[in-house]
Amino acid sequence: MIISTTHSIEGRQITAYLDIVSAESVQGVNVIRDMFAGMRDFFGGRSQTLERALKEARVQATDEIKERARALQADAVVGVDFEISMPAGKGGMVVVFATGTAVKLR
């Protein structure tokens, strides 16, 4: 399964646009362990806890759009876009939303 942020696959022709596929992944962030993330960011550090949560959420969302595209018998998902949200007041959650178009290729 080819996953691409571009709207075409070099060397391949899109023969059918099947459907929009999307997925979301919500990851909890350990607020107590990472309550100093804001200070680290302020002083130029990096929050490994938050980076891990974001990476895991992105991987899960990508895997889910692959599964949904396979169910449509797609060869690829093009135009993939990721949106990241950290809802305020939700106790340290990271939400990644992925969307793209499932296509058939020649």
From Swiss-Prot:
It holds the Pfam family YbjQ_1. InterPro entries: UPF0145_dom_sf, UPF0145_YbjQ-like. It comes from the Bacteria. Gene3D superfamilies: Hypothetical protein apc22750. Chain B. PANTHER family: UPF0145 PROTEIN YBJQ. Belongs to the UPF0145 family. This is UPF0145 protein Pfl01_1745. It comes from Pseudomonas fluorescens (strain Pf0-1).
